[in-house]
Amino acid sequence: MSQHSQYGVPGVPAQSSLSFTQGFLLGQLSVVLLIGAFIKFFIFGEAPAPPSRGLASRTASHHRSYSINQGDNNANNNTNNGSSPRTLREKPSTSNVLRPVPSSATNTRSILRKTYYNAIPTQLSHTKQGRHRIQHSTHQPESLDWFNVLIAQTIAQYRQTAYLLKDSPTSSILDSLSAAINDPQKKPSFIDTIKVTDISLGEEFPIFSNCRVIAVDDSNSDGGRLQALMDVDLSDDNLSLAIETSLILNYPKPRSAVLPVALSVSVVRFSGTLCISLIPASTPQSPSSAPTPDAGNLNMRSLFQHISAELNGTAPNPTATNPSGKKGVPKTNLAFSFLPDYRLDLSVRSLIGSRSRLQDVPKVAQLVEARIQSWFEERVVEPRVQVVGLPDFWPRMGRTGVRPGDDVEAAAAAAAASVSSRSGGGPVEATTLSGSAEEAIIDDSPVRPGLRFRGSATATAGRSDSSFEEIPRASPQTPLDIPGSMPRVVRTP
């Protein structure tokens, strides 16, 4: 019994203590393993591969493989071209930060391959100018339903704007058209003043369809030039113009005889193939930049005005007289024309004479139709094209607006914050918003007599008048606001 109590009893606590230690260590080890697995597979794990761009049937043809050999080939190409690949250890040059674009990136075949467009030439034909033109491509023609909606909205907006400005003395379409057709340098002397009696901008919209992209030979671009062909059709529309004038006989004396003439021309139907392509500007223009005034010739206040104007984007635009860009770089132009197989059906009605009138003379209709056809072919029918410069689509604060119906206070706060961040923390004061435009009026000029707030029933709570209120100017003891200082907090009621 004594031996059992001496050896057996103390042995039980020893076994329980050993099992607790083992369990504690096992639990700690499992927690460490879980944390390590989480860090390895969830935090430092590789991102999954992005989904394929094309359809499931085109996945195999669109698959791109990147291998070590391909990288070696690219490195060899760069070495042969004279430009070695830049490594992280090399210090970049301050004069050549932008990496050169390889010539193959702007090639026509490279663009078609990277955009998965099959424009392989299947039939070549010689044009009158000796160029090769691809008749069609292997890519399926595309419908332009979305493009028709956008064009219809644009034309409808133009029609509405022209009708709203019909009584404007300077922006009326009637005055502009009258000034164009009565140009003394183009109008013959035997035609009296032309008076526009009726204008109809139509009610229907052109329908574009069957769009396809082809590659044409162009000596000015590497690998040819891409061109989009689309069919356009406009029919059953009420697009017409009616005028009145007089034919003057100036022999043997001026205005010896006058013959009144009334004409009405309507477009019955127009159909054709529109060609659109992007071409660079032909000749770069020299830059015209506004010189920066010398700080020694200006006082402190004028210098602050100039710096504040440059920071806030209100400085004179150096590209106002240079449409090609800030530094003379040519812009990209949009060239469009119609193929010679177009169809233009016109309806010409005429009324000649004052007492005994001749109505709808066939010879007059033929002369008018021939003149309109010649005018159209001299401008937009191949090989002649119309070149239009594309606008600048870079986001700018001056073109930023707020959609109608949004929160006015949120729009004012967003506009004030954006202008403040752009001006580098300069003093910016935002006025209340008018109910019509819902745009913040920003003023940061430190030398104006005072800021004016335009009140409105929707912008100012409890204030129904829309008069201007003058804010008293700061006292002479007030320190001068310097751009770059902390902005003042303006609370709008």
Swiss-Prot record:
**Which compartments does it reside in?**
Endoplasmic reticulum membrane
- What CDD domains does the entry give? SMP_Mmm1
> Any idea where the SMP-LTD domain is?
140-391
Instruction: Topology check: give the Cytoplasmic ranges.
Output: 45-493
**Which stretches are tagged as biased composition: Low complexity?**
69-81
Q: Where is the composition biased (Polar residues)?
A: 93-104
A single Pfam family it belongs to is: MMM1
Q: Could you tell me the keywords of this UniProt record?
A: Endoplasmic reticulum, Lipid transport, Lipid-binding, Membrane, Transmembrane, Transmembrane helix, Transport
In the UniProt record, which is one GO cellular component term? endoplasmic reticulum membrane
Q: Which GO terms describe its molecular function?
A: lipid binding
Q: In Gene Ontology terms, what is a biological process of this protein?
A: protein insertion into mitochondrial outer membrane
Q: Which residues lie on this side of the membrane: Lumenal?
A: 1-23
Q: Where is this region: Disordered?
A: 52-104, 420-493
Transmembrane intervals: 24-44
- What does this protein's UniProt record list under function? Component of the ERMES/MDM complex, which serves as a molecular tether to connect the endoplasmic reticulum (ER) and mitochondria. Components of this complex are involved in the control of mitochondrial shape and protein biogenesis, and function in nonvesicular lipid trafficking between the ER and mitochondria. The mdm12-mmm1 subcomplex functions in the major beta-barrel assembly pathway that is responsible for biogenesis of all outer membrane beta-barrel proteins, and acts in a late step after the SAM complex.
Domain comment as written in the entry? The SMP-LTD domain is a barrel-like domain that can bind various types of glycerophospholipids in its interior and mediate their transfer between two adjacent bilayers.
Give the quaternary structure.
Homodimer. Component of the ER-mitochondria encounter structure (ERMES) or MDM complex, composed of mmm1, mdm10, mdm12 and mdm34. A mmm1 homodimer associates with one molecule of mdm12 on each side in a pairwise head-to-tail manner, and the SMP-LTD domains of mmm1 and mdm12 generate a continuous hydrophobic tunnel for phospholipid trafficking.
Q: Which family does it belong to?
A: Belongs to the MMM1 family.
Protein name, per record: Maintenance of mitochondrial morphology protein 1
Organism whose genome encodes this protein: Talaromyces stipitatus (strain ATCC 10500 / CBS 375.48 / QM 6759 / NRRL 1006) (Penicillium stipitatum)
